[in-house]
Amino acid sequence: NDGWNFWDYSGVTVINIVVDHPLYYNQFLKALPEHYRQVNIDHMHIDYMKRFFPDVDVYFIPSAGTELNKHRKLIKDYDYLPMCQRPIDVIFTGNYTPKHILRKQLNNMEQDYIDFYESALERLIMSPDLTIDELSEMCLKQEFPEITDEQLANCMPPMMYVDLSVRFHYRQLVIRMLADSGIKLNTYGSGYNYIECNHPENIIMHGGVNSQKCLDMISQSKISLNVMPWFKNGIHDRIFNSCLNGAVSLSDSSIYIDELFTDRQNIIL
């Protein structure tokens, strides 16, 4: 609060790998260490930074995966399990948060603001090709035609509600479709008791686990499901983790994924 900065005092270069949309961190981007470098995992997040925070040094690096092996050690000494020895057919690693919990972010707002964010969410669900940036600018300029870029940037953080809600909306749709189709899906993460579907018995919940446990179970799975968290020109580490640990990666796509992979050859999209 007094302006003193440990990193500047120590002369340390700070490299921050941001794995969410930068709008989640707008408040911190206004008071950065002198020698600050930011890594983003989506090219569109780079565009956001260059537009709204042009003084910040930003770089694109895709989120990396981690390889285990047959004995589930981080040090590679054996190949991963062949398909015929993998006990899990389909796995999903990650959490699920239902809308009624996310909605608490809006509880202290006036009704006009609540209506605005709910309308924006509905619009994004109906137009899933839009990025959160495009949607936000579209909705805000509709309300405030003369809004400046500075004002637009200041209005972005509350759109976190829309970003999270649409992510979990589609996550639920995919998991519900699989479960109701009779496919047993092993989930490693919290919140799946909230999934609304006709056949919840097909969602085998293992609860919240750490990252190494997720890798361990992917290395024992035939198919690893990924639902992209609204990265339109990036990738999620679930895909690399799946590939590195011998599972078939089943995912929706993005511009960047289309550049890296070929459908039905090294990924199923």
Describe each region flagged by the PLM:
Residues 94, 186-189:
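Short beta-strand segments
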Residues 138-181:
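Alpha-helix-centered segments that form part of catalytic cores
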